[in-house]
A protein has these predicted regions:
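Glycine-rich helix-loop-beta junction characteristic of Rossmann-like nucleotide cofactor-binding loops
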Residues: 44-48
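A transmembrane-helix-recognition feature enriched in membrane-embedded lipid enzymes
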Residues: 3-42, 87-96
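Short, basic, glycine/proline-bearing loop/turn elements
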Residues: 28-29, 95-101, 128-132
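Non-catalytic C-terminal accessory region of glycerolipid acyltransferases
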Residues: 2-21, 109-240
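Catalytic core of membrane glycerolipid acyltransferases/transacylases, capturing the structured
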Residues: 34, 49-105, 113
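Secondary-structure boundary/capping positions in well-ordered alpha/beta enzyme cores
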Residues: 39, 74-75, 99, 121, ...
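A conditional alpha-helix N-cap/helix-loop micro-motif detector
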Residues: 37, 104-107, 138
């Protein structure tokens, strides 16, 4: 059963996550990912157990939302491309906490749904880069997530994801997540200047952790192996 854009947002605002469905999918996905690649997560205590919170991860892969969701105890809501909600799977995605966003312009329906989720005291994950970044390194963080957090009085939790870059299954290395120090928004106003200030405190944590992990020797070898150069790198190391 397909739904219209308006119906999708109404479901997301009024019904939210289906607890039993969310748990079934979460634990099934966790089992599959552990078999295929493995994953670790640190700093989960930085995500409040209740109350509104905006999680701001970097975005390298379609699978990033799944990894964030399976390591946290509380359900997490995500925006997804509107095209994913055009078919019969739309009700399923909506009850898992996803909701549509139309790209290319400010989508007021999606923004209002995000506000409703935070007013309800739920967790919302937004990718500040706006889309998947396929190039090396990270993209520039936009202010929208911080502005929503300020409006809701919700802390920003910077989150670093490594191991999903340009990979197909099976992943050559484990996926690793680090939930950083929350950035409080008390005393800030929902202005472009204050939103820039808030994301400017959160995003450097992601950049620094991502750069630190990418610089590890084992990560360099794994990345080279993924493009067929691993044997050459390892051979050179053995000769030293």
């Amino acid at each position: 059963m397909s739904v219209t854009n308006a119906e999708a947002h109404q479901i997301a605002r009024e019904k939210g996550v289906s607890g039993p469905l969310y748990l079934i999918v979460k634990y099934t996905a966790a089992l599959v990912f552990r078999i295929l690649c493995g994953f670790t997560a640190s700093g989960k205590e930085n995500v409040p157990a209740k109350g509104p919170v905006v999680i701001v991860p970097n975005h390298k892969s379609f699978w990033d939302p799944f990894f964030v969701a399976i390591v946290l105890r509380r359900p997490v809501h995500f925006m997804g491309k509107a095209e994913h909600f055009d078919g019969p799977m739309a009700p399923f995605f909506l009850r898992l906490g996803a909701f549509p966003v139309r790209r290319g312009a400010s989508d007021e329906e999606a923004l209002e749904t995000a506000r409703a989720i935070l007013r309800r005291g739920d967790a919302l994950a937004l990718f500040p880069e706006g889309t998947r970044v396929r190039e090396e390194g990270l993209g520039t963080a936009k202010r929208g997530a911080a502005r929503l957090a300020i409006e809701a009085g919700a802390p920003l939790v910077p989150t670093t994801i490594t191991g999903t870059e340009k990979r197909r299954w099976p992943l050559p290395r484990k996926v690793r997540m680090v939930f950083g120090t929350p950035v409080p928004v008390e005393g800030l106003e929902a202005t472009p200047e204050d939103a820039a200030l808030a994301i400017g405190q959160a995003w450097p944590q992601v950049e620094q952790e991502y750069a630190r992990w990418q610089a590890r020797p084992g990560v360099i070898v794994a990345g080279a192996a993924a493009i067929g150069l691993g044997a050459l790198v390892v051979s050179k190391r053995r000769k030293k």
